[in-house]
UniProtKB/Swiss-Prot annotation:
UniProt entry keywords in alphabetical sequence: Acetylation, ATP-binding, Cell cycle, Cell division, Cell projection, Cytoplasm, Cytoskeleton, Differentiation, Disease variant, Kinase, Nucleotide-binding, Nucleus, Phosphoprotein, Primary microcephaly, Serine/threonine-protein kinase, Transferase
Disease note: Microcephaly 12, primary, autosomal recessive: A form of microcephaly, a disease defined as a head circumference more than 3 standard deviations below the age-related mean. Brain weight is markedly reduced and the cerebral cortex is disproportionately small.
Gene: CDK6
Protein kinase domain segment(s): 13-300
Superkingdom of origin: Eukaryota
Protein name, entry field: Cyclin-dependent kinase 6
Activity control: Inhibited by INK4 proteins (CDKN2C/p18-INK4c), aminopurvalanol, PD0332991, 4-(Pyrazol-4-yl)-pyrimidines and fisetin, a flavonol inhibitor. Activated by Thr-177 phosphorylation and Tyr-24 dephosphorylation. Stimulated by cyclin from herpesvirus saimiri (V-cyclin/ECLF2). Rapidly down-regulated prior to cell differentiation (e.g. erythroid and osteoblast).
Enzyme Commission code: 2.7.11.22
Disulfide bonds: none
Known tissue expression: Expressed ubiquitously. Accumulates in squamous cell carcinomas, proliferating hematopoietic progenitor cells, beta-cells of pancreatic islets of Langerhans, and neuroblastomas. Reduced levels in differentiating cells.
PANTHER family with a match to the protein in the record: CELL DIVISION PROTEIN KINASE, CYCLIN-DEPENDENT KINASE 6
Gene3D superfamilies: Phosphorylase Kinase, domain 1 (3.30.200.20), Transferase(Phosphotransferase) domain 1 (1.10.510.10)
Organism, scientific name: Homo sapiens (Human)
Organism taxonomic ancestry: Eukaryota, Metazoa, Chordata, Craniata, Vertebrata
CDD domains assigned: STKc_CDK6
């Protein structure tokens, strides 16, 4: 351990293979030499430092992640450690040590044989996804980049959210890479560069919900404007009252369109599933369903998991006041 309480990654973890590379840096599968050689996932991030050392925002974000870890929520990936690799006057290389899960939702969907994911499995996975998201939101943590690649699926079908609450930690690394972050799961308010909060994650959930049925993305745009156009082709052009006022792109830039039946794009979805999907894919974030409300949606009424006490994994609301609201 160093004086800042962070471990030295090169002393405890032995890299086995590189398992991913994205906008945020490289991800390695490694052995934890101090814990029986268990496999972990190492995410390496470069953080810009100044005369005062590591930015307060980064320290705060790490503190939030460590606080969330104390709850050991079943639908949130475990954060075992935060380590430093090396330091210079300009940057510190952080290594975030997470539990290792062999596959993400993208891999899972690719492997599923015809005719696709059973509807009851989709329902179960959606419930777990929403339960993990509600936990994050109850701590005022917005995921911001929810997509199948950072939803992990264990061999027993357990869903775990990964890569949440890391936007500030990753911001410096993102400036150094040319990797394009996918637009396909981004909410309209993000594409329009409007202000946003927790509802952005529910839009992403809607896109992922549809993809579980389709096994391919619902909206596949090539730019912010193209992505928005593809969204409006399906859900229709919203009224003037629902268009955000703090954006440069006016509603008039898009042709007037009516909403198309969602079952045209998402076959095999039942009426209750369709209702939940449309509540997630609501253009106006103020009218979009919350994760907490979605857990009580009639779509889940026949799911055995719903009989469990949802509050058993939720922190007391009064404990969120000291947490990061960014």
């Amino acid at each position: 351990m160093e004086k800042d309480g962070l471990c030295r990654a090169d002393q405890q973890y032995e890299c086995v293979a590189e398992i991913g590379e994205g906008a945020y840096g490289k991800v390695f599968k490694a052995r934890d030499l101090k814990n029986g050689g268990r496999f972990v996932a190492l995410k390496r991030v470069r953080v810009q430092t100044g005369e005062e050392g590591m930015p307060l925002s980064t320290i705060r974000e790490v503190a939030v992640l460590r606080h969330l870890e104390t709850f050991e929520h079943p639908n949130v990936v475990r954060l075992f450690d935060v380590c430093t690799v090396s330091r210079t006057d300009r940057e510190t290389k952080l290594t975030l040590v997470f539990e290792h899960v062999d596959q993400d939702l993208t891999t899972y969907l690719d492997k599923v044989p015809e005719p696709g994911v059973p509807t009851e499995t989709i329902k179960d996975m959606m419930f777990q996804l929403l339960r993990g998201l509600d936990f994050l939101h109850s701590h005022r943590v917005v995921h911001r980049d929810l997509k199948p690649q950072n939803i992990l699926v264990t061999s027993s079908g357990q869903i775990k959210l990964a890569d949440f609450g890391l936007a500030r930690i990753y911001s410096f690394q993102m400036a150094l890479t040319s990797v394009v972050v996918t637009l396909w799961y981004r909410a309209p308010e993000v594409l329009l560069q409007s202000s946003y909060a927790t509802p952005v994650d529910l839009w992403s959930v809607g896109c992922i919900f549809a993809e579980m049925f389709r096994r391919k993305p619902l909206f596949r745009g090539s730019s912010d404007v193209d992505q928005l156009g593809k969204i409006l082709d399906v859900i229709g052009l919203p009224g003037e009252e629902d268009w955000p006022r703090d954006v440069a792109l006016p509603r008039q830039a898009f042709h007037s369109k009516s909403a198309q039946p969602i079952e045209k794009f998402v076959t095999d979805i039942d009426e209750l599933g369709k209702d939940l999907l449309l509540k997630c894919l609501t253009f106006n974030p103020a009218k979009r369903i919350s994760a907490y409300s979605a857990l009580s949606h009639p779509y889940f009424q026949d799911l055995e998991r719903c009989k469990e006490n949802l509050d058993s994994h939720l922190p007391p609301s009064q404990n969120t006041s000291e947490l990061n609201t960014a």
